[in-house]
Regions:
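Acidic/glycine-rich phosphate/pyrophosphate-binding loops and surrounding catalytic core
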Residues: 141-169, 177-181, 186
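Short, compositionally biased
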Residues: 128-144, 235-241
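Short, basic/aromatic beta-hairpin or loop at an interaction surface
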Residues: 82-96, 189-204
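Residue-level recognition of short, solvent-exposed, well-ordered loop/turn junctions
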Residues: 55, 110, 148, 162, ...
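Single conserved hydrophobic/aromatic residue that forms the stacking wall/gate
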Residues: 1-7, 11
């Protein structure tokens, strides 16, 4: 959220109106934002490297190796590795996997697969987090549409981010676009603050109504990463992954 003036006055008014106002620990300084931005550049460079090399016939473990090697080559550390026991340096989620898939030598990409590669980087102490969908070769029109609409949902969310509006405004833009295209948004998993830690407050939902949730203020840094489902929003945790 870009800088602006009049923070104190707006805070007082919003608190009086009963809205959720972010604490000072959520708001980053300009120096911290610059550090997060530099981390984000490394993160995107790693995703670009994956984009140049991903193809049918490789394992998701190969993607993990690319991410780990490239991140370290650029001076970063893969944030997922060892985080709450996660055993790999990247999350790879194929087709009906919603998120947080664990790379494996046994999982081989096939023509027509769609895969989300979720890269997170620590660079000079700052965290960044971004994912990208890839279509392996040619796929079905239904899968192509799902990937396209998911990207559009992110773009609609970004357009709705403005100082002194609400996270619910962003969520409404994301959810509305998904529904207009016949899709649903996962409720139980959302975005999060990021920058000084991997996962920070606030929790970022993509299904809450306009005018609700936390006030967006200058200096906040958070992810917009809706999980868009073809079908219902229901999910379950795979015991093997």
């Amino acid at each position: 959220v870009a800088p602006s003036r009049g923070l104190g006055d707006v805070y007082k008014r919003q608190e009086l109106e009963g809205h959720i106002v972010p604490g000072h620990d959520i708001i980053k300084t300009p120096e911290q934002i610059e550090g997060i931005r530099e981390s984000g550049k490394v993160n995107i460079a790693v995703l670009d490297y994956v984009a140049e090399n991903i193809r049918a016939g490789i394992s998701t473990e190969q993607i993990n190796k690319w991410v780990d090697d490239k991140t370290r080559e650029l001076g970063g550390i893969p944030a997922p590795l060892g985080y709450e026991g996660f055993p790999k340096s990247v999350c790879t989620s194929i087709n009906d996997e919603v998120c947080h898939g664990i790379p494996s030598e046994d999982v081989i990409l096939k023509e027509g697969d769609i895969i989300n590669v979720d890269v997170s980087t620590i660079y000079k102490g700052y965290f960044s987090d971004s994912s990208r969908m890839f279509i392996i070769g040619k796929t079905t029109p239904d899968k192509e549409k799902l990937v396209r609409v998911a990207k559009e949902c992110v773009e609609e969310g970004i357009k709705a981010v403005k100082p002194w509006t609400f996270l619910g405004d962003m969520a409404d833009a994301v959810n509305r676009h998904a529904k207009e295209n016949g899709y649903s948004i996962v409720v139980d998993i959302g975005g999060h603050g990021v920058g000084l830690e991997f996962h920070e407050d606030p929790f970022v939902s993509y299904v809450t109504p306009k005018g609700t949730e936390m006030l967006m203020v200058p200096g906040m840094v958070f992810t917009i990463e809706p999980m868009v489902n073809a079908g219902t929003a229901e999910i379950y945790q795979d015991a093997d992954n």
